[in-house]
Design a protein with these regions (language model features):
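C-terminal motif of bacterial Sec signal peptides marking the signal peptidase cleavage site
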Residues: 17-20
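Post-signal peptide N-terminal segment of mature Sec-exported envelope proteins
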Residues: 29-52, 56, 63
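Positively charged n-region of N-terminal signal peptides that target proteins for export
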Residues: 1-10
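Non-catalytic cap/lid and distal C-terminal segments of serine-dependent acyl enzymes
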Residues: 32, 54, 61, 65-356
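Bacterial signal peptide processing site
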Residues: 22-24
Length: 356
């Protein structure tokens, strides 16, 4: 009897042990299965019912794809390649004229700011785009006039640049942007009329620093001007074309888009260009080499076949840029001279390729 009792006890203990082992095995299997489901949902997210904990976890992991899509959308804006299309110079004159029913934005004239570079007040004209919102952030194009001009040369009520931008914006050819008519003269206003060519050239050179040090901060403080080189462009014609190249290469970390239209040959030394003259004094001994992250986003050079002065200098600048490995677009355009007919078609091309 005692032997039977002992045997029954041993059998009961063994059965309990087997049941316990089975329960532990089931727990381990469930944990592995649950972990596998979470990993699978992270990668493929199949349609299935999930617990509250799993649902919360999935909400957290799916935030990553949302951020990625936002980044892709931001990147898509920079995927536009301004070098992928040729520029156009045979344009309808109506592009530069006022058209009924077109919003040409808001033109602010004779806006004054203090320039520490000039140690005096300077003035600019400012074009705000249609629908301007002071709480927004708009890229800015700084436009520099030629020798003897001022901030009103290209941007005044009804000017070609004023009408051109409004018409391009209406047709979806231009991005919302602020355009600033820059005064290249950077010095004491009281002595401007007394300066000779060398003195005027020295005052013009100072605009390179004035734009970056004084004017850009003024625009950000008083207007909805976006920061960053991807939101900043500089363009100029003739002497202003030289200064736009100087400004762009002096401040590569601040300026991403540069246009030198028939630029004078004083950015760097150009052999045979007005020797021993204030026209030929080089601003740079050597053109600064951009780092990989400060390469111009779009660099545009153009000159007309009938230009009496700056064909050689423009071509030389292009050759130097090519030797430096700096991407740029150089157009030698048949039939155009050194005048506003050329400036306006070039600005059409430049405005259509910036801030995309």
């Amino acid at each position: 009897m005692m032997k039977k009792l002992i045997i029954l006890v041993l059998i009961s203990a063994l059965a309990a042990g087997m049941i316990a082992c089975h329960d532990n095995s089931s727990d381990t299997s469930y944990q592995k299965e649950t972990k596998s489901v979470v990993q699978t949902e992270y990668e493929t997210q199949p349609e299935m019912q999930t617990s509250a904990i799993q649902t919360e976890a999935l909400q957290e992991v799916t935030e990553a794809p949302v951020q990625k899509e936002t980044g892709q959308a931001d990147q898509k804006k920079t995927d536009f390649d301004p070098y992928s299309t040729d520029n156009v110079y045979d344009l309808n004159p109506a592009l530069f004229e006022r058209q009924d029913g077109t919003d040409y934005g808001t033109l602010l004239t004779d806006v004054t700011y203090f320039s520490t570079t000039a140690d005096d007040d300077k003035r600019v004209n400012i074009l705000l785009p249609p629908g301007y919102d002071e709480t927004g952030a708009y890229p800015v194009l700084y436009m520099i006039h030629g020798w003897g001009g001022d901030y009103t040369a290209h941007l005044y009520d009804g000017s070609y640049l004023h009408m051109l931008y409004g018409n391009m914006y209406r047709d979806g050819l231009a991005e919302p942007m602020i355009i600033v008519g820059v005064d290249m003269y950077t010095g004491k206003q009281a002595i401007k009329d007394d300066l000779d060519g060398y003195g005027l050239r020295a005052a013009y050179d100072k605009t390179v620093d004035d734009i970056a040090v004084d004017l850009m901060p003024f625009m950000r403080e008083h207007y909805a001007a976006a920061q960053g080189r991807e939101n900043t462009a500089v363009a100029g014609v003739s002497e202003g074309g030289a200064k736009s190249l100087c400004t762009g290469f002096q401040w590569l970390d601040k300026i991403g888009y540069i246009a030198g239209i028939a630029p004078d040959g004083n950015v760097i030394s150009v052999s045979g260009y007005y020797s021993d003259s204030y026209w030929s004094i080089p601003y740079f001994d050597v053109l600064p080499q951009p780092a990989q992250d400060t390469m111009p986003i779009y660099l545009y050079l153009a000159v007309g076949s009938e230009d009496p002065w700056n064909i050689h200098s423009t071509e030389y600048f292009s050759e130097v840029l090519e030797s430096m490995g700096v991407s740029h677009q150089y157009d030698y355009v048949e039939g155009f001279g050194h005048d506003s007919d050329f400036w306006r078609v070039c600005m059409y091309n430049f405005i259509g390729k910036i801030f995309k």
